[in-house]
Amino acid sequence: RFDGKAFLEIEPIKNLSIKTSFAYQYNQWNSIGAEPAYIPQDSYGNPVGGSGKNYLTDAYYSETQWINENIITYHFDVNGHAFNFLLGQSNQYNNFRSTTATGEDLPSDNITVLNGALSTSAKGDAAEAALRSFFGRVNYNYKDRYLAEFNLRRDESSRIPKKNRTGYFPSVSVGWNIAQEAFMEKYSFISQLKLRGSWGELGNQEIGYYPFAQYIGLGNNYVWGDNKVSGVAISSLANPDIKWETTATTDIGIDAAFLNNKITLTADYFYKKTSDILLQLPIPGIVGISTEPYVNAASVKNEGWEFALGY
């Protein structure tokens, strides 16, 4: 296993910062498993089943992940108005590869190499994914009294078909720190009083490596003349029209504290809706394929109130 990170940050002019970072992670493991020969017997010592064969399994797995981020920030104040700007770009990549080999009927249970097996078989798998993002943020603060923030992300994922690969996800939040207003000075028992609201969208790309692709299965042999011929066949249907799953969240809340923060109160109303959820919907058996294609076919809503009172 290797896990490392490096970064470089410079400030070419006052209040302007430029930072680049790179993180890399590599994981690898190997395992060998053995199953000794065993023939179950009844109470009279007669064999009652079992192959009488021993088995050996040799497995290998490796995974690589890396991320590169490049971020520029700038901030300045003018007569109590504070502005913060952020502009960034990131690249992410990950892949994995696995191989499993199995041997059976070895001359001894003590042999742990596949060359000693009478017959062997192997299977493997590999996949990769990449995500490229651009993002920006503007933050405004006036004397900790009026607060506002706007964010925008542009994500491009290899897990989504090319025609819908790019998604835009904005968010905005505002706050009013009422306790900082001059007219609140006569209410000395109120230590804190803040109203806030936010709305934003996020995209979900954790939907498998190739949910839009058509899969081909091996082992579909057929007869041509007097000969058995190896063949392939479609094992799952493709849907090149799938798109990002998107979650939109709205939150409106109030934070309050009384008697020098001895009593605290937080209240929130939230509304969350996830749209275009990917599902595998049933298809008619006459199609002849058992694995259904992914479809953006569902949505889920959550709505409610949250209260917290502390002393």
Feature map (PLM): residue ranges:
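Extracellular/periplasmic, surface-exposed regions of secreted and cell-surface proteins
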Residues: 1-35, 46-311
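N-terminal, polar/charged subdomain of small-to-medium soluble alpha/beta proteins
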Residues: 35, 40-41
